[in-house]
């Protein structure tokens, strides 16, 4: 990202100059997943447990959603995370923008659709 959070530290991620691309988010999640940061493993596992959304034994979904608003309109939705299957781990970042109805739930729906086309059923 560009590290520009501005003066409003309570809401710097909404409507500010802060820019973090989906690719940068994916890279961050990959490093968290493999603990390339060298953090205490218990702390990394605590974060992973906190973002676990579902576990149906063959597919585990970890992630976080968000919604950016302008006035009452949902204009920016995102869903970032990773999915563990028996055979692989997939790291993803979905970001959608629109004049309205762009929210975290819509980003989940898009993500679910993409993985279902890959043959991976997500229970969220």
Please identify what each model-predicted range represents:
Residues 26-124:
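Structured C-terminal helix/loop/strand segments within mature extracytoplasmic catalytic/sensor domains
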């Amino acid at each position: 990202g560009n590290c520009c959070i501005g003066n409003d530290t309570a809401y710097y991620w909404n409507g500010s100059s802060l820019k973090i691309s989906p690719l940068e988010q994916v890279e961050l999640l990959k490093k968290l997943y493999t603990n390339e940061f060298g953090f205490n493993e218990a702390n990394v596992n605590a974060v992973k447990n906190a973002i676990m959304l579902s576990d149906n034994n063959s597919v585990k979904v970890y992630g976080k959603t968000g919604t950016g608003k302008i006035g009452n309109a949902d204009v920016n939705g995102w869903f970032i995370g990773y999915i563990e299957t028996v055979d692989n781990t997939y790291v993803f970042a979905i970001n959608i923008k629109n004049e309205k109805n762009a929210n975290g739930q819509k980003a989940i729906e898009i993500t679910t659709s993409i993985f279902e086309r890959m043959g991976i059923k997500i229970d969220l």
